[in-house]
Amino acid sequence: MGDPKKPRKKWMGPKHPWIKERLVRELELVGRYGLRNKRELWKLETLARYFRHRARSLLALPPEVREKEEKALLARLNELGVLPENATLDDVLNLTAEHFLERRLQTIVYKKGLARTIYEARQLIVHGHIAIAGRKIRSPGYLVKKDEEDLVDYAPTSPYAKRRLEEQVQQEEAAS
């Protein structure tokens, strides 16, 4: 049978460790998006780099060959919600890690108002208070697809969901 394959790391760190502009930019992104460490940022930079590389390789192909793969690449990025439907390969070449940081579950929970801070959003997710379509997701780095975005809410078993339901009932009683 053989041994299972060794899991490879899914990120590539910076080529030079002490470039001040990069360090300042990374620190600002870590703070703004509530990341635990820079490795979380580097994973998304690697993902953006992968899609940019695919776009460059597609641009090198003849037009009749690249058409099918170009549609698949753009459809994937549209499904993730990173690019709009009418995007082109030039838009893919402009992708950055920030495009993917905006699609993280942690960021979406904060922007939907389910948490007061980005750090509270991370804690709610890790503690199992957030679900997508009723399914608990405990990974703050989960990339939320465009069609899942409306389904992000408190988990049905969470005390936060029960508290919000009680508040809604009280508001309805007060209104009537």
Curated annotation (Swiss-Prot):
A GO cellular-component term linked to this record: small ribosomal subunit
Domain of life: Archaea
Keywords assigned: Ribonucleoprotein, Ribosomal protein, RNA-binding, rRNA-binding
Similarity comment text for this entry: Belongs to the universal ribosomal protein uS4 family.
Presence of keyword Ribosomal protein: yes
Gene name of the record: rps4
Protein name in UniProt: Small ribosomal subunit protein uS4
Organism of origin: Hyperthermus butylicus (strain DSM 5456 / JCM 9403 / PLM1-5)
Subunit structure: Part of the 30S ribosomal subunit. Contacts protein S5. The interaction surface between S4 and S5 is involved in control of translational fidelity.
